[in-house]
Amino acid sequence: MALLVEKTSSGREYKVKDMSQADFGRLEIELAEVEMPGLVSCVTEFGPSQPLKGARITGSLHMTIQTAVLIETLTALGAEVRWCSCNIFSTQDHAAAAIARDSAAVFAWKGETLQEYWWCTERALDWGPGGGPDLIVDDGGDATLLIHEGVKAEEIFAKNGTFPDPTSTDNPEFQIVLSIIKDGLQVDPKKYHKMKERLVGVSEETTTGVKRLYQMQETGALLFPAINVNDSVTKSKFDNLYGCRHSLPDGLMRATDVMIAGKVAVICGYGDVGKGCAAAMKTAGARVIVTEIDPICALQALMEGLQVLTLEDVVSEADIFCTTTGNKDIIMVDHMRKMKNNAIVCNIGHFDNEIDMLGLETYPGVKRITIKPQTDRWVFPDTNSGIIVLAEGRLMNLGCATGHPSFVMSCSFTNQVIAQLELWNEKSSGKYEKKVYVLPKHLDEKVAALHLGKLGARLTKLTKDQSDYVSIPVEGPYKPVHYRY
C-alpha cells in the first residue's frame, strides 16, 4: 500500500484528500463555532492558563466540521494533536484540509479502504521515537483497541518469538489490525508498550466504545484509565437522541430522495438513538414499528404510540429499516431477501455488523448496482427484486449526510474537553486507576448551563428556604447520580 505522509510548509504531517479545500473548510468551521457555545466557553475560561500545554492528544473521531472546532479547542488549551477519523465514510474533506493546514496533524479522507483506515489510525498514534500520545479522544474504541492488541502481541512475541497470525481470524478488518501489529513488531518490538507506559488515559465518545472499555475492565485487561463521555447526560440524552432525530431523515433524503410520509419504518432498538430515530420517522409521517429485546424500552415505545413487533413479523411489509442497537447480526441476508423491492436498509449504530453485509456480498448471484457514493441497490437473482443499502451498512448519517448539527455536538465535545482536562490535571495524583469513570454530576450540569444562553433560556434560582426544604444546594448539583432524566 503506497501511502505516504505529506508535510505542510511548517513541517506538520498530514494525509488528506485535497488541501485546496482548506479555505472552504475554514469558512464552515467559523460558522460552526457560533453554534458551539460550550467549546467557545472552554477556550474563554481555560485558554489563558494553557492547562493542556505539553500534552500529546491522539483523536480517533469523525473528522467533521464540528470535530474541527473540538480539535482547535484542544490546541487553544495548549495541546499538540494528531487526528484520524473513526469511520471510513465520515470524514468531511474540507474540514480535514483546513485542520491539516492550520492546526493539527490529520490523516483522514472520505471513502478510505479498511487498509487505509487502519494506516491512518496508526499514523495518528505515531508520535515518533518518543512513544505515543499522552491522551486519546476515542469514538468506538479503535485507537484503544490497536494499543491493547499491540501490547498483547508484543508480550507473546517477547515470550516465544511468535508473530500474530492474520489468518487466525475470519474477520477481514481484524486481519488488517494483526498485519499492522506484525509489521510493527519487526521494526520495534516494544512500540505499543512504550505507548502504554506514556498514556495517561482515554475519553470515549460512543456507546460501542464504552462497551469495549467495560468489557476490558471486567477482565482486568484495561491498560489505562478511561472516562466514559457517552453516559454523561449532556451527551447520551442530547447527541444520541436529538442528534439522531435530526440526522436520520437528513441522510435518508440525501441518499434516496424518498418521501418518508406514508411509509412503514422499522427501527431496530429503542435506546436513546432508537428513540431519536423513531421520533424523526413519526414526525415525518411514517408509521413506525420498533423491535426490542428490553421490555422497559418496548413499553416506552408503546406509550409513544408505536408498534412493537419482531423483525420477522414485518420484514416483508416495511419500506425503511434502520438498525440502532450497537449489537451484531440484526438484519441478516435472509431478512433482506424477503423485503419489498427497493426497501431501504441502513444503520446508525457505530459498526457495520448490525447488517449482514458479508452475507449480502457473498450471496450467490447477487448484483450490486452503485446508484451514487454510499447508495447501492442489491438485486437478488431468485426474486429479481432489490434492496437499497446505505453507506455499506456503516453509519448512514455520516456516510450519506454530515452527521449531527453543531449545537448538539457542542454538548458532547464540551464533555470531551472536560474529560481530557480532568485526566491531564490528575495524571500524577493517583485519582484515576485502570478503570472506567463517568464525569461527576456538577460538570454535566455545567455543560448544559453553557448552552442555555444561546437558546435564550433563563434559569429559575432556588431561594435558601427552598434549598433547605428539598435538600438541594442552591448552586447544584440538582439531581442524584441515579436520576434517569
UniProtKB/Swiss-Prot annotation:
Required cofactor(s): NAD(+)
Biological process, per Gene Ontology: one-carbon metabolic process
Organism superkingdom: Eukaryota
Catalytic activity: S-adenosyl-L-homocysteine + H2O = L-homocysteine + adenosine
Keyword field: Hydrolase, NAD, One-carbon metabolism
Pfam family, one: AdoHcyase
InterPro entries, A to Z: Adenosylhomocyst_ase-like_sf, Adenosylhomocysteinase-like, Ado_hCys_hydrolase_NAD-bd, NAD(P)-bd_dom_sf, S-Ado-L-homoCys_hydrolase_CS
SUPFAM superfamilies assigned to the protein according to its UniProt record, in alphabetical order: Formate/glycerate dehydrogenase catalytic domain-like, NAD(P)-binding Rossmann-fold domains
Any single Gene Ontology cellular-component annotation: vacuole
GO MF assignments: adenosylhomocysteinase activity; mRNA binding
Key word Cytoplasm present: no
Pathway annotation from the record: Amino-acid biosynthesis; L-homocysteine biosynthesis; L-homocysteine from S-adenosyl-L-homocysteine: step 1/1
Residues annotated as binding substrate: 64, 139, 205, 235, 239
UniProt cross-references to Gene3D superfamilies, sorted A to Z: Adenosylhomocysteinase-like (3.40.50.1480), NAD(P)-binding Rossmann-like Domain (3.40.50.720)
Residues reported to bind NAD(+): 206-208, 240, 269-274, 292, 327, 348-350, 397
EC number from the UniProt entry: 3.13.2.1
PANTHER family the record matches: ADENOSYLHOMOCYSTEINASE (PTHR23420), ADENOSYLHOMOCYSTEINASE 2 (PTHR23420:SF16)
Further comment: In contrast to SAHH1, a mutation in the C-terminus of this protein is not sufficient to abolish transcriptional gene silencing.
Task performed by this protein: Adenosylhomocysteine is a competitive inhibitor of S-adenosyl-L-methionine-dependent methyl transferase reactions; therefore adenosylhomocysteinase may play a key role in the control of methylations via regulation of the intracellular concentration of adenosylhomocysteine.
Family the UniProt entry places it in: Belongs to the adenosylhomocysteinase family.
UniProt-recorded name of the protein: Adenosylhomocysteinase 2
Organism: Arabidopsis thaliana (Mouse-ear cress)
Lineage: Eukaryota, Viridiplantae, Streptophyta, Embryophyta, Tracheophyta
